[in-house]
A protein has these predicted regions:
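Short cysteine clusters
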Residues: 102
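Cys-dependent protein tyrosine phosphatase-like superfamily
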Residues: 2-98, 110-143
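Substrate/cofactor-recognition hotspot
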Residues: 105
Length: 143
């Protein structure tokens, strides 16, 4: 997967089971489902931006299209190691493929990178992150 949906949504495959994107909109949920996703993880806190739909709105729209939705918010620049562990557990329990999103995709990518500690070799984590446009080198000591 490396889809551009509409003019706003840019979905990039991080792994075969996980893609990341910037903020998704209610109006794009059908397209997300039609693209084959089975679950969504929201990593953006409610109220971060004036034009963003709440997680409750996202979850309701997701349900309409048979998608599961989970809320794991983190403030920009404040993703904790624990967030990465919970993210990893969600990836193991949610049906895939999964779409994770935040404002830009950086927090979702960071949580994935942290979740892969001891699972995926570090060079592969860095390479996959770079391919979707995010540099995780600053996280090396935490992975």
């Amino acid at each position: 997967l490396n889809l551009t949906i509409g003019t706003i949504m840019d979905i990039k495959a991080l792994t075969p089971n996980l893609s990341i994107s910037p903020q998704i909109l209610i109006s794009e949920m059908q397209t997300v489902a039609e693209a084959g996703f089975k679950a969504i993880i929201c990593n953006r806190p409610d109220g971060e931006g004036p034009d963003q739909p709440s997680f409750q709105e996202i979850e309701a729209a997701a349900r309409q299209y048979g998608l599961q939705a989970q809320y794991l918010p983190a403030e920009t620049g404040k993703v904790r190691d624990e967030d990465g562990k919970v993210f990893g557990q969600l990836l193991l329990t949610l049906p895939g493929p999964v779409l994770a999103y935040c404002r830009s995709g950086m927090r979702s990518t960071t949580m994935w990178a942290l979740s892969q500690s001891g699972v995926t070799p570090l060079p592969q984590i860095l390479e996959a992150s770079q391919k979707v446009g995010f540099d995780m080198k600053a996280l090396v000591q935490r992975i």
